[in-house]
Amino acid sequence: MNSTASTPSVSWWRPLAKVDRWAILAIVIIPTLLFTIPALFGHPAITNDNLIQNFPLRALVGKIMATGHLPLMNVYINSGSPLLGGLNAGAFYPLTLLFIFLPPQVAWAINLIAIYITSALGMYVLLRWHRLSPVASLAAALSFTYTGAMLGQLVHLAVAQGFALIPWFVLVFLSLARRLRDLPETATLREIVGRVRTSVVWFAVLLGLTFLTGEPRSIAEIELLGLIVVPSILLIRSSYFLVSWKKRASYLLTLGVGGVLGIGIGICQLLPGWAFIGSSNRAAISYWFFGSGSLSVKWSALFFIPDIFGGNGAVAGPGYFVNYNLAEVTSYAGILAMIGFFAFLSRLKRKGWQGEDKDFVLYVVVAVVGLFATWGSFTPLGHIFHGIPLLKSTRLQSR
């Protein structure tokens, strides 16, 4: 193939091959067994912040809504504290509604299973869209889902819920660009709307779900993802590059419409949450506080060897022996991801990546920007990240 711009759009799922069906079955079975078997023996995955915040607050939401009332107030904290506005309960997230009808631990297990199916399936579908083989796509999907932040942030349910949607967001961004690329330059407004309406719906739903998680860090991560991916799609010449300004404008307008609809879906959580944050100490975060959770550049070795500074002391291993919270360093991506990343870097030629390799340059950009975001105030670029709305109100970049 001489030009990535001529890459045809391929619906790999029509028909769904047998190997794809087996891969999807594995994606469903693994988290189902992982979370149900320990729970059946009295060891549900409820620890740390999930134990003291996320699980009991969701159980409280279910109890309140079962009586026919909205989950507006938690009367059991101090003299009362906002429950919906407090965000941690994820009160209107669709799967939180299961706590109304099911025993809390059962509803919790279903939530966890759904997160990890969503994550792995999203990465699998994204890579199959990129025309990678089923085996490679499955390996990458499992590596993404069961290493790094997806596994390390299991103790923060809503963070994991937001992270699980990342592959789906990238897929929407890329597929929308390719849909518009395939349109003739003479396409009418009706033809453009007909081509992009599916992407509008998907983007709105994904954005709405992110808002409904009630997790500012998930929302900020998706914000940062969009700020990286969308400009990269518009600037990097690849199979989804949009040549004309008309198509670029249509691309941005489509995302804008989807964004407005997504805000409409999540507005019931956004408004009380924003009001609550506005009256808290998170309303104005200093640069020092913002950067207090940044990862020192010299500790980037944790990306490759997560226990290089010790671990939890299990199985005669050494305990953690540096002055930082081990649980907050969750960037380990796994050996498969590292091999794949450096193998791709080895294909770089003097004139850059060539052919279909250009489609994956986007992920190098994400990795580089992600590194600087993780290092935060340890680099001069930390001030740039502190200037991004919403992101500047979060901390713990090492997550």
Q: Predicted regions: what is each one?
A:
Residues 28, 118-130, 134-181, 188-236, ...:
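Membrane-embedded helix bundles of polyisoprenyl
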Residues 1-37, 239-243, 249-259, 356-363:
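Start-transfer (signal-anchor) and selected internal transmembrane alpha helices
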Residues 239-253, 326, 341-380:
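Membrane-interface helix-loop-helix junctions at transmembrane boundaries of multi-pass membrane enzymes
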